[in-house]
Amino acid sequence: MDLSGSLLIAMPSMADPRFERSLVLICAHSPDGAMGLVINKPVEDLSFAGMLEQLNIPRAPNGRDIRVHLGGPMERGRGFVLHSPDYMSVGATMLVSGKFGMTATVDILEALARGQGPSSALMALGYSGWGPGQVEAEVQRNDWLTAEAPSELVFSDDDPGKWTGMLRHMGIDPLTLSSTAGHA
């Protein structure tokens, strides 16, 4: 089971408060583990413009303003830009299932600051990581639902509504979602 490009949707029974009502886009998944970015938990006290200022990256008047999210509990000082696949930085952009790109170099920040770069993007500070077999065990334990990641939902500005919106997209009423696992 390769979850690359899939969304993990936290179940109501999620025991880890860091992932309560979270959506995590899995960017890489292999027998060695998995890496993903939480896409619906904005950082309240840091704007993209403020981050550019901290990094001494000048912002043009037409510079883009993308949302900054907490990508996960690992390496929170490290930044990742999740974006549409219409932007590629040679040797630096990782293509995720052909639907998304992930770039973690300063060139994408500079492009966005100039008003260029990908048509859709969000910034993530930190990432979510799993060791070998860990994410599969969590899915099996019913901590997460998995689904294909719709681009329009991933890049939506409605961060508070993304979790419920994804469940509804899957045909699930969040009020009737059971936290009890059943296995045949």
UniProtKB/Swiss-Prot annotation:
GO terms under cellular component: cytosol
SUPFAM superfamilies for this protein: VC0467-like
InterPro entries per UniProt: AlgH-like
Family: Belongs to the UPF0301 (AlgH) family.
Protein name per its UniProtKB record: UPF0301 protein RSKD131_2391
Organism annotation: Cereibacter sphaeroides (strain KD131 / KCTC 12085) (Rhodobacter sphaeroides)
